[in-house]
Design a protein with these regions (language model features):
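Surface-exposed, interaction-prone regions used to assemble/regulate multi-protein complexes
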Residues: 1-194
Length: 194
């Protein structure tokens, strides 16, 4: 899939921008304090926005919007696009294709997978040049769920990761799958259940 990078990052995330996150973590106490106030306002604005679109969200999209995945470890992010009906002998007036994305995360002792049926290409935006946080061991920072105003019946999931990248996922549907890892002892050995 093509990765597009034409938007500046503050135009992608509407509420929890990378710029605000950098200011929030500033060593300058005055900057961090101002950012803390701005962050609280962003939380309230996003909650109001989410409340305003909630009646238009199907249950599975509401479930994603209600997840709290901050600091979850990103295990895998797979994307696949396929032609829709390669064996069809009947010509169609427009290209038919389907695409899926799977985002797997570990949060505490739970593995969580978000399985998206995509409505368009996922757009990946690189970290800002001044991104000062680690680019290894990627973790989920903040996300925003929104309506895709350009495509009726579609939704957007924007995610800011700890390496500074932002993904904008246009999707038609999503499934959340969870399973718990076995409990471990202090040495990290899985405890027997039976």
């Amino acid at each position: 899939m093509k990765h597009q990078t034409e938007k500046p990052s503050e135009k992608i995330m509407r509420f929890f921008t990378p710029e605000l996150y950098l200011q929030f973590n500033s060593p300058d106490e005055a900057v961090a304090d101002r950012a803390d106030e701005a962050w609280e306002k962003a939380i309230h604005k996003y909650q109001r926005h989410l409340q305003s679109i909630r009646p238009k969200l199907p249950s599975q999209v509401k479930e994603v919007a209600e997840l709290s995945l901050h600091d979850a470890e990103v295990l895998a992010f797979e994307r696949e696009m396929q032609p829709g009906f390669p064996l069809s002998k009947t010509p169609v007036p427009f290209p038919i294709w389907y695409a899926f994305a799977s985002l797997s995360l570990k949060q505490n002792q739970t593995i969580l997978s978000l399985l998206y049926i995509l409505g368009d290409h996922i757009q990946e935006y690189p970290a800002k040049e001044d991104w000062q946080f680690s680019r290894s061991d990627t973790h989920w920072l903040y996300d925003e769920v929104d309506l895709d105003l350009n495509h009726q019946g579609m939704f957007l999931h924007r995610i800011l990761f700890s390496d500074g990248r932002i993904f904008e996922i246009p999707f038609m549907s999503v499934v959340v799958s969870r399973f718990s890892l076995p409990a471990t002892d202090e040495a990290g050995t899985a405890k027997r259940i039976a």
